[in-house]
Amino acid sequence: VSRRIRIGVGPVDGRSPRYGIDQLDTVLDGMWWGDNVLWVVDDGLSSVDVVLAGVIALADGRDVSDRGFSRGAFDLRDHASIGAVADTACTVVREGKTALWICPRSSVPPALRELAQVIVDQNSTHLRVERADGRRSQVVGTEMPYAVDDGIATVGPPSTVSRLGAGLRSIRKQRGWSQADVGAMIGVSGSAISQTERGTQSLSLDTAVELAERLGVSIDHLVHGADRSYELSRPASFGRGPSRLAPSSPQHFRIVAFATMSLSSSSTGSVSICIGSGVVKLEMADDSIVLGPGDVVRTTGSELRACRNLSAHPALIFQVNEHS
């Protein structure tokens, strides 16, 4: 796969698309319509096709756009191909498709990393979830070991170490603390907390208990992490639950191509952001999410920061303040 990127488009007949990897499907709640999944692999890694055999087999031959492909390759040495990657990824979001992009680590297009709602990193021994828009916050950082034997891949359950790291990361980010802040609570360095969050180093049981006490949470809460600061709904036509705005008069904004608009709200209650058209990234205090037409995010006014148009077309968004 060196210096090339491949795309597979999942089934579009109403079935819920899956990775075909039980552990990953459980962690990520399968694939979601409208998602670009970026699968980053070590250059020359041969096991990627075995691990992804299930989802590759599901690519059903339907076109993701008028480019006329459902499985294809882009040469990342070609600037025109890189532009086509971004255009196609935007089409996936706009039209409620599901796309899996397999890309060598040394050649990940920045635009695709920006647009991907899910990012999975695969090395020779582990799968690691790097991004997971809309899923539980503790999913990010989850690692699963895998092995390939006689052409068959076996993926193990998430490691306890990675679950603890992911949970700690979500609590820390929700509270706006640095890794050094957390380390100071239990007398370790910020670097040690960083290694814990990445799953490369485990805290002892005594230290984990002390940390939970300092944070004012249970060990179970520490492992499972904090909830997301937002709720996401998508159109029923994408195979998910219905979306609706609160019964209020929304403000509407038009964002020109590739522009960023500052967002804020004085609302003392919840705020709903609905995407009328376009592909945008909603920036919040400690999180962000890529959104397409019909997507609705419910959060609080204090969380909102900005909305960035990721495509070459204008975006229309609506903001509804739900006063308490």
Where are the regions that the model predicts?
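Short acidic-glycine-tyrosine-enriched beta hairpin
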Residues: 285-305
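P-loop NTPase motor core
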Residues: 66-114
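Glycine- and acidic-residue-biased ligand/ion/polar-headgroup-sensing regions
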Residues: 268-285
